[in-house]
Amino acid sequence: MPFSLVRIDEDDVLEYVFERYTAINSDADSIRQDLGIQDSKSTTLNIEIAPPKSLINDTNITKKGKKKKGNKSSSDYDFYSFEIKQNVTSLHSTRDNDNSTTGYVLWSLTPVFCEWLLYNEQASPLHRAQMVNICSLEKKIIHDIEFPSLLNEDTTVIELGSGISSVLPILCSNFVGTYICTDQRGILNGLKQNIANNLDLVNKRTIVSETLDISNIQEQPTNSDDETIPIKPTTQLEVAILDWETFPKSIKSGSSNILTDFVKPHGTIFLLALDVIYNEYLINPFLHTLHSIMFYYKNQREIVALVGIHLRSDDIVQEFLEKVTTEFPFKLHVVDDPQWSHSRYDIYYITL
């Protein structure tokens, strides 16, 4: 059964936050009690995105996203093994990147979200468009909607606050037509390097890019008779500077920038943001950027946002939800799924 969406209106915020943190406290023994850094000491991380053992026999899959031929179940799931360089020194610096340093390391929500997205049956609406229930805070079904597919070749993904790791863009580039990573200038060199180091994990599609130097990394394979193997579909993978504090509150019609030049003329646009709301100073700039991009495209095609938040301070989460529901013309829902409800993470679905 797919996930449902719980509607959160202005009048629901206080009750929702209270109930959510009450649930977190009751699950405290089974939930990691830390800030959410995947590894705060290592400069090189080996991260595996793999199906749980309940879904597949471990002996039927291999690393680097390549699967052995065998039974049907082994061909249904991919296994990604990342090597990620992160900068722990810059994380603690007061000088680097204008003191905005959280993007220099991998945070735990990213691999958790990726495994849920790929392997959890309740995430199936993100694989193929289907109907999902809209429920009240009391979990009463109000109506249903067709949820757009994320892992679709017609989808454009714009990630806000990509960070240094490359996990999400590499994984999604096996499925989507366009993926645009954005972050502050100081983060992008490390992100580009991690993309280059893990590009072999994109084995379903061929990457093309105007902002990444990948000409010598991903080449068209040939067979033993020197005949070109059938060309794979392409994914446009780009990296761009985007600072929420300086981003315009409205994008002028006809503007030319990476957010407009590389977006396909059809298909759904997904704005993705994972663990980017962790203090009150980021909330307004982030929401203004989100609204600016969504408003620009709203009359051209479907555009939606998935925002994942690590639930640390209840005051920060409450302020974020209050601003979403009172200061912007957004419709707010939270993904209702057992994996998330018994964790310290929420995934919010935001539309205009």
Curated annotation (Swiss-Prot):
Q: What Enzyme Commission number(s) appear in the record?
A: 2.1.1.-
Q: Which InterPro entries match?
A: Methyltransf_16, SAM-dependent_MTases_sf
Q: Which residues bind S-adenosyl-L-methionine?
A: W107, G161, S162, G163, D183, W244, L274
The UniProt entry's GO biological process terms, in alphabetical order, are: methylation
- Extract the GO molecular function terms from the UniProt entry: S-adenosylmethionine-dependent methyltransferase activity
Its Gene Ontology cellular component terms are:
cytosol; protein-containing complex
Show the Gene3D superfamilies listed in the entry.
Vaccinia Virus protein VP39
**Keywords recorded for this protein, A-Z:** Methyltransferase, S-adenosyl-L-methionine, Transferase
Q: Does the keyword Zinc-finger apply?
A: no
Family, per the entry? Belongs to the class I-like SAM-binding methyltransferase superfamily. RKM5 family.
Describe the task this protein carries out: S-adenosyl-L-methionine-dependent protein-lysine N-methyltransferase that methylates 60S ribosomal protein L1.
PANTHER family, alphabetized: HEPATOCELLULAR CARCINOMA-ASSOCIATED ANTIGEN, RIBOSOMAL LYSINE N-METHYLTRANSFERASE 5
Protein's UniProt name: Ribosomal lysine N-methyltransferase 5
